[in-house]
Amino acid sequence: MLAEDFIREARSAQPELPPPQLLQLVAYQEALPENAEGDDQNAVFRASVLKALSKNFSQEDRPLIRFLLEQEIVFHENSWGIFESIRLCGALLFLLAQAGDVGLLWEAKTANFDTMSGFDIQLLVGAGVTQTLAYLQQVEEEWAEDARIYLEECQQAGDFQNLECYREGLRASLR
């Protein structure tokens, strides 16, 4: 199946996620030991779906993008390094600008040592710094407090001063 065909089939199920038999094509699947491709049998196809999706996406694609990010998080929790696919998921959710995605984006940021340094903190505040911090203030969970404190420190350090330039740069990179 081609990535474009996968997206077309996935969109036919909107606003719900596609059926499990379709999702299994992009779900994290631990690779067999002799597989030289990496730790995830579906990583390459998932990356091609993300690349194709990034050319034309909307709010209706958000459940699928979130699912893809969940798979990338599991992949990164079980591997070293950071791959472009997790960054691309983050970029798409950043551009969709929903404060409710910050929890999943925080999971991506903290998936491993390399994502902590290589997954841009700006990706967590697509809805805006104030809106994201207000959302986190309402969530009574430990991760939310950790994320809020980290974001406040980043705000004080000036990491969000050029957020609109960052947004425009992401948009331009997807064209």
Give the location of each predicted region.
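Structural detector for internal amphipathic alpha-helices that build alpha-solenoid repeat scaffolds
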Residues: 44-56, 79-96, 118-127
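Extended aliphatic helical segments
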Residues: 26, 43-44, 49, 74, ...
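Amphipathic alpha-helical scaffolding segments comprising HEAT/armadillo-like alpha-solenoid repeats
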Residues: 2-4, 16-35, 59-76, 98-110
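N-terminal alpha-helical scaffold/docking segments in eukaryotic complex subunits
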Residues: 1-57, 150-152, 170-175
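Compositionally biased, low-hydrophobicity segments enriched in charged and small polar residues
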Residues: 59-92, 130-136, 142-143
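Alpha-helical repeat scaffolds in large eukaryotic proteins
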Residues: 11, 48-58, 69-73, 94, ...
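Long, helix-rich interaction regions
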Residues: 1-15, 81, 102-175
